[in-house]
Amino acid sequence: MEAQLSLIIMSPEQVLEQCEITYVKLPGKVAPFEVLKGHAPMITTLNSGKVTYQTRDGDVKSLSVKSGFVEIRNNKVSVCVEL
């Protein structure tokens, strides 16, 4: 599967994941949402929940988070979370 987005997930202490992905699902403050290639630029806060993403190899991974924020720009998704 061809990767279409770059993802970096970090906490205040360390980089938790950095990879190429096809999609990511995030626990938005108002409602969960999914980011695909070509998503509009956005910065928003995250609630507690799961960050779920699919790598270019087709593996689906997830990470439980307490809170955080995400910046989406030019097919790059930067997520800063509190675990």
Label each region the model flagged.
Residues 2-83:
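Compact, glycine-rich, soluble single-domain proteins
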